[in-house]
Amino acid sequence: MKINLGGRISFVFLKFTMNKVYLFLFLIHFSSFANNCNNSVKEIYQNIITSIGNNSLYPPELHFSDETRSVAYMSSKGITIEQKTIDLFCGKGNFEDKIAYIIAHELAHYYLEHSWMSNTGLSYASSIGEFVEDSSSLYSVKQKKLSESQADLYAGFYGQIAGYNTLGFGEEALTEVYESYSLPKELNGYPSFDERIDILNSRRNKANDLALLFELGNVFLKNKNYNSAKYCFEFILKNKFNSREIYNNLGLSYLL
């Protein structure tokens, strides 16, 4: 029996070459897919910044990181979100809503100037990722819970008027983050995971109500029902939410 080794070697070589080609094409596709998600994150970030419209603080810059320990955090450079976090949600359902929650929550701490998040110098530890176990009396657990409540309400409202259901998918996003990063559910001096979920859910209805009031105010303004529009925008401002659009629309309600 005569075996054609040359033909067999050629076949194996061809198969090996094709596998390399498939792998190369897969990597190109994956890289393109990841870039699309990163571009979406940039767009989401800008949309939320625009919805906040706060000129009292210079908008922080967005940065991506290849580290895999902090999820998202504030620093003197701005807001950083890890690529691992983006990849966690990339290509899955409600990607924009989940990423919007992460981003809006960090932006909330930035604009609300929650200095308890300060770690060392001008660096910060994220309320979602790299935790600070601070037992100092200056910022008690009660104060941290209040700050988290404020941040979720803030993130819910501004995320909603930017077009994202941030608090509707906040619990799902947090759960996936905790599991992916193997974060402990209990931390000394900080709200537990269950408390974070309770805080998030407790603020959902109020954030949605305020966002609905904002949309109603716009409808009233468009239909020349100026007194009702004034009530909507003033009620939102009395709840300590402001943006250029809210003030502009309130001003139009008085002028028209």
Task: Briefly describe each language-model feature range.
Residues 34-256:
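A Zn2+-metalloprotease active-site environment signal
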Residues 21-30:
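Sec-dependent N-terminal signal peptides
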